């Protein structure tokens, strides 16, 4: 039993075959259906519940913040996904943070943070961490036997969709995404969570792995992510994320 928690990444936005939420979608080319296909091809019997909701953020606080600054946010992981994780799940994957970082930078663009934008970003990273703890606790309460595999964030400031953004916006996106990865997600390895390290994976920064919007992966991008998820599920030992790498400070 595999429950996937995520946003449009889970439904495969940007892929050649995108899935609708909550469907098995066996022919999808996002990382969730590709992961399911690869596991089935290796002989695993697998039932999939893809809980991904496009535009979703981690918690109600980020949903409210985004709506205050005119972002379309259809839901959040804690309220609309966590309660529906399959109770007999053996694997749960979580990919959170991309829409949350974009919400933070949108708020900054709308004047939030005033003269101390760094402090605002850091406060939002802490709020994200509190939400992530709530999400994990709820998932473990629903599916106590599940192996939990999470993906950290790449440095969003370096992705193609922000190539023409202002230096200030890119610096904020870097501070938020690196903060989320290093202070919230990577430390989860101490809680028996497997962390897939997109932050320090050079493939996460190759423009050829992204769709035309520069934010969502294409089939190639989702393919490499699925390969890592499958490796994490099937390996007895998966490498811990890097403590530091050049990608964390790519924007001066």
What are these regions (language model features)?
Residues 1, 90-93, 147:
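Structural motif
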Residues 4, 30, 34, 80, ...:
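Extracytoplasmic/secreted proteins, especially bacterial periplasmic and envelope-associated proteins
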Residues 5-6, 151:
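Short hydrophobic segments within beta-strands
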Residues 8-12, 53-59, 97-103, 154-159, ...:
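Solvent-exposed loop/turn segments at secondary-structure junctions
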Residues 13-130:
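Conserved SGNH/GDSL esterase-like catalytic core that processes O-acyl groups on lipids
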Residues 153-252:
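Catalytic His-Asp segment of secreted/periplasmic serine-dependent ester chemistry enzymes
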């Amino acid at each position: 039993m595999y429950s996937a928690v995520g946003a449009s990444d889970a439904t495969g936005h940007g892929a050649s075959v995108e899935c609708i939420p909550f469907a098995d979608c066996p022919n999808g080319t996002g990382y969730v259906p590709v992961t399911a296909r690869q596991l089935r091809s290796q002989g695993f019997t697998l039932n999939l519940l893809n809980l991904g909701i496009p535009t979703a953020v981690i918690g109600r606080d980020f949903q409210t913040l985004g709506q205050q600054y005119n972002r379309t946010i259809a839901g959040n992981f804690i309220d609309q996904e966590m309660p529906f994780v399959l109770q007999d799940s053996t694997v749960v994957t979580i990919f959170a943070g991309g829409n949350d970082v974009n919400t933070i930078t949108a708020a900054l663009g709308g004047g939030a943070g005033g003269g101390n934008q760094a402090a605002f970003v850091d406060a939002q990273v802490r709020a994200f961490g509190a939400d992530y703890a709530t999400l994990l606790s709820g998932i473990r309460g629903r599916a106590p036997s599940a192996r939990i595999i999470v993906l950290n964030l790449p440095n969003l400031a370096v992705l193609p969709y922000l190539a023409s953004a202002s230096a200030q916006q890119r610096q904020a996106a870097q501070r938020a995404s690196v903060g989320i990865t290093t202070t919230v997600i990577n430390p989860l390895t101490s809680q028996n969570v497997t962390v897939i390290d997109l932050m320090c994976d050079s493939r996460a920064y190759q423009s050829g792995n992204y769709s035309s919007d520069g934010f969502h992966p294409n089939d190639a991008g989702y393919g490499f992510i699925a390969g890592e998820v499958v490796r994490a599920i099937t390996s007895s030992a998966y490498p811990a994320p890097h403590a530091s790498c050049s990608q964390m400070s790519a924007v001066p």
